[in-house]
């Protein structure tokens, strides 16, 4: 794996949300753990420019706060997927391959190995970012660069408890 990065590179970041969430929950042993996108994305980009950021998420229940935050901070979006994110993410990566220099895939799923090989054959630099324990070795080896997600890249989310309002009793 080479680690040469050109400063003028344009980057697309494609996140398999369900895969990353399951990996982080498994590693942290907590369902309340969330990926800290605000620290991870700048770390992944370095001095490169972000062209696209898309968070693929299975299901219809998608946090509007996440979608809003991605849009405000990175002009990113959340794409709901019917089942797994594998196919929609692969299609989008293939579509973007002519528009970017580098594609960073946040997933350790070995299902992406053929996508990685295809993108590399098209001249795209492919980087994988995932939790080490849940990353397929073949995916890590095939990528041009591997970024491990560590406990520094997530946080425990505890929603603020709503205060119960008491009605004032009238005498």
Model regions and ranges:
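Domain-level signal for Mg2+-assisted phosphodiester chemistry and nucleotide/NA-binding surfaces
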Residues: 1-85, 95-98, 125
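Nuclease catalytic cores that cleave nucleic-acid phosphodiester bonds
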Residues: 59-171
